[in-house]
Amino acid sequence: MSHQATYVGRPGDAIDLARAAQIAARGAGLAALESGCHMVEAHGHAARADSASCAASLNAAERAYSRADSSHPAWLDYFDSAYLSAKTAHCFRDLGDYARAAQFAEQSLNMTDGYLRGRAFNLCLLASALADEDPHEAARIGTEALDIVGGLESHRTHAYLRDVRHRLAAHIDLPDVDHFRRQVFTITTRAD
């Protein structure tokens, strides 16, 4: 719920929900889950442009992650260093630190096979971090995400693609960027 609260623009609720979940995760002895809860709190702080609180939550997430072991429930298998990198990239992107966002988004692509939608998210995250500095590369990476998405009916995936499209708007004069933006428009308007 905390992640969803950030996604719908309610970072204060995201922070409150993440803090409550941290208590439950600690009580259950699930360090990986606790780390994830700190990450979601960090993202809430980033959405509020509170870099100091975001950094504190990122550090808490790292500490909790270092205590995690492999004996967690199967439903936590998705939570690995690639996932942690993706969440960190989100934070830095939302804080406007695009170089660090790109660094962590690149690391997030070292993810477990089989999570196609997650890979598309991470590619979009990298493309959005690169949009200002290297629009050609952002369009290329965004196109890679489009290829993965194919016929996926995912509102969130389309939101990620629209975000990249929006961030590339200043570079519409570049043919590859314009082509990517048109593809995103076609795919997301047809599906939504």
Language-model segments: residues:
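Conserved binding/catalytic microenvironments
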Residues: 1-192
